[in-house]
Amino acid sequence: MDIKVMEYAAEIARRQSFTKAAEHLHIAQPSLSQQIKKLEAELGLTLFHRSHGSVTLTPHGRRFIEKAEDIIRSRDDLLREMQERSQGIGHKLSIGIPAVTGRYLFPPLLKQFLARYPHVEVQLVEKDPVSLEKMTAKGEVDLSVLSLPIEDERLSITPLLTEPVVLAVPKEKQRWMPPELVALIEKALEEDEGRQPCVPIDMVRNVPFILLKEGFGFRRTVLDLCAESGFKPNAAFKTSHIETAQSLVANGLGVTMAPNMVRRDKDPGVIYLSIQSAPSRTLVFVFLKNRYVSLTAQAFMELSRESLKQTFDEGCLGNKDENI
């Protein structure tokens, strides 16, 4: 059985169309169809249901594609490893990143990496964390940067950064604010930045809360922190962007929790308060278990950890021993 035919079958399954697969593979559709018929005859099994132009996998087909993709990945891993043993750092690296991490954390890291390895072509894949976890588990990207917890047991993790979770609240007094929160904000405005008071999470139990939508790892972090204090946040708004959440806070529409890296200290409408018990979130590199981790990926992970260790001091990183 030719591995090339496995690749043909996998592409048909991926695109659910012989026509689209043939276009992508740059071969004639009749030739592609004939190759698959020969494969099915060799196996004595039907791999694809063909009906009115649509193509779906049979149960036998699903199993075949699952194993075929494992074989293709193993072949690709072997070729990459042998190439790197011969030539050193490779030429391509694909990295999955959520939008916020990509916007705030990655630009300086990429600048340093490409300055050291200018020949490497880096492909950034920006998706929501749930999609990135699935893509990484399928081997569709070399690695991703996500926040704990990681649920897929097929994935390995390497810690990158632990940072505090802070509470963003309006600077101006709002009708919905409990007196103790108002007093805490007033005290914080009077203190130096390094001496600001901490807020108990329970203090925002009944205030309007701005949450990220489903599918964001940081949303899970916030819900877990609130659950540990015995309450579910009163969600006034849900958004896909942490910047939008902070803007809503600045306009007095509620409070939100945010990773320390995204705080907007120059925003005149928002003040950031430390939270009692020093909750944190941990960013990790995520990659597929039992798969060759390229020298290129290893180099990027090592440079990133070194760079962030120099950039963030102990106060920025928070409690390094506490994972969420």
Swiss-Prot record:
Domain of life (superkingdom): Bacteria
This protein's name: Uncharacterized HTH-type transcriptional regulator YcgK
Gene Ontology MF, one: DNA binding
Annotated Pfam families: HTH_1, LysR_substrate
Residue range(s) of DNA binding per entry: 18-37
Domain HTH lysR-type as annotated: residue spans: 1-58
Gene3D superfamilies per record: 3.40.190.290, Winged helix-like DNA-binding domain superfamily/Winged helix DNA-binding domain (1.10.10.10)
GO cellular component terms attached to this protein's record: protein-DNA complex
This protein's UniProt keywords: DNA-binding, Transcription, Transcription regulation
Any one GO BP annotation for this protein: regulation of DNA-templated transcription
Species, as recorded: Bacillus subtilis (strain 168)
Family in the record: Belongs to the LysR transcriptional regulatory family.
Coiled-coil annotated spans: none
